[in-house]
Every structure is written in C-alpha cells, then in structure tokens.
A protein has these predicted regions:
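Active-site-proximal alpha-helical scaffold in enzymes
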Residues: 76-88, 138-142, 146-190, 228-249, ...
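Conserved beta-ketoacyl condensing-enzyme motif
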Residues: 6, 30-160, 189-198, 294-308
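Phosphate/pyrophosphate-binding loops at sites that engage ATP/ADP/AMP, CoA/4′-phosphopantetheine
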Residues: 83-95, 244-249, 281-297, 319-323
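ACP-dependent fatty acid/polyketide chain-elongation machinery
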Residues: 1-63, 242-252, 350-363, 407-411
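Acyl-CoA/ACP chain-elongation machinery
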Residues: 180-225, 258-272, 302-309, 326-376
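Glycine-/small-residue-rich "gating" segment that lines the acyl/pantetheine channel
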Residues: 123-129, 167-170, 174, 190-246, ...
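Conserved small-residue
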Residues: 8, 26, 80, 101, ...
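Condensing-enzyme catalytic core mediating Claisen C-C bond formation in acyl metabolism
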Residues: 3-7, 31-34, 212-288, 297, ...
Length: 411
C-alpha cells in the first residue's frame, strides 16, 4: 500500500508572499484584509478585500511573459516554485514523467476577461489580445505551473468553486495511491479582487458590508454578515512516502483521507444541518481508518456567512458528537479572507504546518459568540496542541463538499 506525505509548501496570501511570512502573521493573529487598492471602489457597495500587496511577478516569471498570464496563473507559478524549493525537490528529465500537477481555481482569469471585454466593447474585435483565451481559461493554473517547472505527469485543473483547492489535493493524493505519479504539485489559486468580482459577489449578498477591514471577516460570531474576498495561492508538494524517505525529505504530515460529496440542494446555500459536509467528513475518516476521538484540530471552511458557519458547526457535531467540543476548530478566513478556489490550498498548508509544529492558528475577531456556533474556535490567540489527526474542510457553491485528513507522521 502506497502512502502519501506532504514535503513542500508554497504560499502567496494576503498575509504575505512566502510560507514563512504568511505563517508568522497568521499565528500572530494579524489580518491581511484592507481597503481595496487595485481599482476605484467609490461606486461599489463593498470596499475591502484580502489583496496580496507584496507580490512581484518578476520574482518568479520573465518580464516579457507576464502579460500572457492572468494573475491567478502568476500566483500558481509562484506558489509552485516556492513549494518545490521548500521541498528541496528538483524536476529533471529523468523524473519529470512521474511528477504531476493538479491546481484548482474557481473562476480563473477574471482580470483578463474584464480587460479584454472592455477592449472589445470600446475599440472593437481587432484590439482583443491573442493571449486573451489562453490567459483566462482555468486549466492554465495547472498548465502554466507545469510548463514553468517541467512536470510531465498527470495534469488537470479542478473547478468546484470554493472546494477546488481541496479537491485538487485530494485528487493528487489519489493519483499517487494509484501509482500514476510519485510526486504531485497540488493546491488552488484565485485572483478575483476585480470590479466585476466584487460587484458580482456583493450583489449576491455574499460579501460582508462591515466597513472595518480588520473586523469584517468574523467567522462563527453572532454578527457575521458575509465573507471578505481574498486572492492568492496555496500549493503543496505531495510525495510517495518511500520516494520522500529515499531523498531525505522533510515530512510535514501524512495525507490519509479524502472525502467528497454533493448536496444536491441549492446553487449557493449549504444543505440544512450540513448533511453533505458531514458525509464528506465521515468518508475522509473512513479512508484514513481514523477514530473520531483521534481528531484534535479542524481547519473549518468558516466563511463568516450566516448559513455556512451554523451548518458547518452542526456537521461537525453530527460526526463527532460530544468529542466535537474537544476539537480545536478554527477558520483562518478571519485573517486571509476567502480565496475561493485558492482557499483549500492555503488551508491544507496551514493544517500541515499546524500538525508539524504542534500549534493551532487562531480564529480572530471572536468577541460576540453565536449560540448556534458553540464549538471551541481557538479564539484570537494561537494555541499549542499535539495534533494526531487534523482535517481541512472546503464547501463550495453548487453543493461541493471536500475534506482532507492529515495525520502526524511517525514513520
């Protein structure tokens, strides 16, 4: 039986470019959400987002190539390079066919679509860039990342809205189990802090209208009123255990379970009581031969919307019963905002680092408890805990539920 471990992490987030900066700021309870700087929001109802303000694409990509890439692809390439460097793994002609890439995105090149549609309307069809389509289509998250690092194994992009990154990592885990690859580059990326992105989610009444950027994303609280849009990418290097051991790789955690279900309920709302999420959690536990009482930490989807947080809390209680109250449950979206298709990538990385270092990041802005959300949400301060098993939950529009289970690696 093949086993799969996490050996590399690359992060580009509103908390900073690079794993170390993001992780430190997360543990310190910092918030990467602020007033939007990418465009004028004066005519919008929402003025805040989690932007990646310290990202310079030229640190990762040749200047002449940047204009051919949507921002979501730039993030994916950068996080992939960061993850491979962290794993100390070099792709060579000899191993390239055994290295695959699965990077999800919920929306793709929205910045490119806006830019080129504006040209089409204002200047006519001849002014539309020949790079419009390849820069915008979602599969270029994986396509471009694989091109830039030379990975020739399984290559695809998963599109399941806010579950995209988690499904990508789960599918990569299965690819290694099935011996389709020895190493997989997997995660999610998103760049939708754009005029139409903000307007679309705002008009859907999905976004918080709280004017205070540092307090607006407040998962599980009584006065939560919607999520805050974020951008960035999170990429993991997954590796077959013996392959990793042979090269002396650092192991963050072992990937042991993956659950995926559908609600068949509503386009944007979760099923009542989180029924679909509960089934996905059970599926991940069963694959990993995990006893419910072994789970010590859950990185919840925790979007800060009234419906999600209540129903996800109920799903956790349905699966774990009284043990649910002993689990540290957090939502790191209070700090990063919601990266949509990128969320599962960064949150799986947070789970792996939490297990590796024995520390649970906080859920910030916990100052107004909701009686319907009554679990232990690691309020406001990081907490040390020896984590045997942890979960990362992602639940997407369309009723997509994806759960990853990681275990502390002990040999």
């Amino acid at each position: 039986m093949r086993r799969v471990v996490v050996t590399g992490i690359g992060l580009i987030t509103p908390l900073g470019t690079g794993k170390e900066k993001t992780w430190k700021n997360l543990l310190d309870g910092k918030c990467g959400i602020d007033k939007i700087t990418a465009f004028d929001t004066s005519e919008h109802t929402v003025h805040i987002a989690g932007e990646v303000n310290d990202f310079n694409p030229e640190d990762y990509i040749e200047k002449k190539e940047i204009k051919k890439l949507g921002r979501f692809s730039q993030f994916a390439i950068a996080a992939t390079k960061e993850a491979l460097a962290d794993a100390k793994f070099e792709i060579t002609p000899e191993n390239a066919e055994r290295v695959g890439t699965i990077i999800g995105s919920g929306i793709g090149g929205l910045d490119i679509i806006e830019q080129e549609i504006t040209k089409l309307v204002e200047k006519g069809p001849k002014k539309v860039s020949p790079f419009y389509i390849p820069a915008a289509i979602l599969n270029m998250a994986s396509g471009n990342a694989s091109i830039y690092v030379g990975a020739k194994g399984p290559n695809k992009t998963v599109v399941t809205a806010c579950a995209s990154g988690t499904n990508s990592i789960g599918d990569a885990f299965q690819a290694i189990l099935l011996n389709k690859a020895d190493v997989m580059i997997a995660g999610g990326t998103e760049a939708t802090v754009t005029p139409s992105g903000i307007a679309g989610f705002a008009n859907l009444k999905a976004l918080s209208t709280n004017p205070d950027p540092k307090k607006a994303s407040r998962p599980f609280t009584a006065d939560r009123d919607g999520f805050v849009l974020g951008e960035g990418a999170g990429i993991l290097v997954l590796e077959e255990l013996e392959h990793a051991k042979k090269r002396g790789a650092k192991i963050y955690a072992e990937v042991v379970g993956y659950g995926e279900t559908g609600d068949a309920y509503h386009m944007t709302a979760p099923s009542d009581g989180g029924e679909g999420a509960a089934r996905a959690i059970k599926m991940a536990l069963e694959q990993g031969n995990i006893k419910p009482e072994e789970v010590g930490y859950i990185n919840a989807h925790g979007t800060s919307t009234p419906a999600n947080d209540k129903n996800e809390t109920q799903a956790i209680k349905t699966v774990f019963g009284e043990h649910a109250y002993k689990i540290g449950v957090n939502s790191t979206k209070g700090s990063t905002g919601h990266l949509l298709g990128g969320a599962g990538g960064i949150e799986a990385a947070f789970l792996a680092m939490a297990i590796d270092e024995g520390v649970m990041p906080p859920t910030i802005n916990q100052d107004n408890p909701d009686p319907a959300c009554d679990l232990y949400y690691i309020p406001n301060k990081a907490e040390k805990r020896d984590i045997e098993v942890g979960l990362s939950n992602s639940l997407g529009f369309g009723g997509h539920n994806a759960i990853l289970a990681f275990r502390k690696y002990k040999g």
